[in-house]
Amino acid sequence: MWNKNRLTQMLSIEYPIIQAGMAGSTTPKLVASVSNSGGLGTIGAGYFNTQQLEDEIDYVRQLTSNSFGVNVFVPSQQSYTSSQIENMNAWLKPYRRALHLEEPVVKITEEQQFKCHIDTIIKKQVPVCCFTFGIPSEQIISRLKAANVKLIGTATSVDEAIANEKAGMDAIVAQGSEAGGHRGSFLKPKNQLPMVGTISLVPQIVDVVSIPVIAAGGIMDGRGVLASIVLGAEGVQMGTAFLTSQDSNASELLRDAIINSKETDTVITKAFSGKLARGINNRFIEEMSQYEGDIPDYPIQNELTSSIRKAAANIGDKELIHMWSGQSPRLATTHPANTIMSNIINQINQIMQYK
């Protein structure tokens, strides 16, 4: 059976399909719907404070008794100067003026927020914790393992996969360059991140690690799931496929933009957050490209552009908001998450029967 392997056994799920923990875009309904359909729903905790994460976990548990996970951002060493912030504020001033916004006061709470997330995951006995942007400390990994939390790391290269296994991860997401949203890279210099496609990355990682590999990047339906399994993956992680679901927290602006875009419309940019991410191209990305080398690292840039993105979204201006999307938008639907899951499973079974 295609759906019975080490990963499904480890995560206590029926199907090896993981809904990506997209920060700012998941809802309890989305997470629970995927879990209730036999996959692993994942809370995107990246931007949550402690109380928000606790409430989200409690709400998910009201909707499902099945396994689910929480995705967290691993803090990274920030590299920026005061002149970078001053220059960026000057470059962003025309956008703020047009939207009647004041210059924000930047507050960096990334390290403390991460520690609180880990404490909450342990306190609430969350079954699975997924990491992006790096590998946590040995101490944190030990604490989570002692609490029987299954750990999933993210790798965009073979070297990152090896580092994840060595650190004690139970499984690894092999994130191909087709994936929407932030790149999970952490070993390469910030402007030279690996851009290896899913079909190349997955088998190369499978061949050098002994733990389950989860394919991610451009996978939208049953065909992508089966292709990943043939490459050696024991599961898939899907983001954009669930982002356009009516159960996600995506705005209608973003949902419509993805549904109406094509495979050539996305670009890699750090304009919005300070970390390279794939999204639909727009005016802000193009105008900020001239400053690409001077953009402050995440979370500084993310803080500096936050009010602009929120104000633009409120007035329906898609030229000034981030529209994260993978490279397979033509395959996106607005179905409820449980319908997306059943369609994927039915398509896989039909293909298997035909073959």
From Swiss-Prot:
What GO molecular functions are on record for this protein? nitronate monooxygenase activity; nucleotide binding
In its UniProt record, which GO terms are filed under biological process?
response to toxic substance
Q: Which residues of the sequence carry a binding annotation for FMN?
A: 71, 175, 180, 218, 237-240
Cofactor (UniProt): FMN
User: Keywords on this record?
Assistant: Detoxification, Flavoprotein, FMN, Monooxygenase, Nucleotide-binding, Oxidoreductase
InterPro entries, alphabetized: Aldolase_TIM, NMO
Keyword Nucleotide-binding included in the entry's annotation: yes
Instruction: Please name the Pfam families in this protein's record.
Output: NMO (PF03060)
**What reaction does this catalyse?**
3 propionate 3-nitronate + 3 O2 + H2O = 3 3-oxopropanoate + 2 nitrate + nitrite + H2O2 + 3 H(+)
Disulphide linkage map? none
Co-factor note (free text): Binds 1 FMN per subunit.
- What Enzyme Commission number(s) apply to this enzyme? 1.13.12.-
Q: Which residues form a coiled coil?
A: none
Instruction: Please give the SUPFAM superfamilies that the UniProt record associates with this protein.
Output: Inosine monophosphate dehydrogenase (IMPDH)
Family (UniProt): Belongs to the nitronate monooxygenase family. NMO class I subfamily.
Q: What does this protein do?
A: Nitronate monooxygenase that uses molecular oxygen to catalyze the oxidative denitrification of alkyl nitronates. Acts on propionate 3-nitronate (P3N), the presumed physiological substrate. Probably functions in the detoxification of P3N, a metabolic poison produced by plants and fungi as a defense mechanism.
Misc. remarks from the entry = P3N is a potent irreversible inhibitor of the key enzyme succinate dehydrogenase in the Krebs cycle and electron transport chain. P3N has been shown to be a toxic metabolite to bacteria, plants, fungi, mammals or any organism that uses succinate dehydrogenase.
Q: Supply the PANTHER family for this chain.
A: NITRONATE MONOOXYGENASE-RELATED (PTHR42747:SF3)
The name this protein carries in UniProt is Probable nitronate monooxygenase
- Which organism is this entry from? Staphylococcus aureus (strain NCTC 8325 / PS 47)
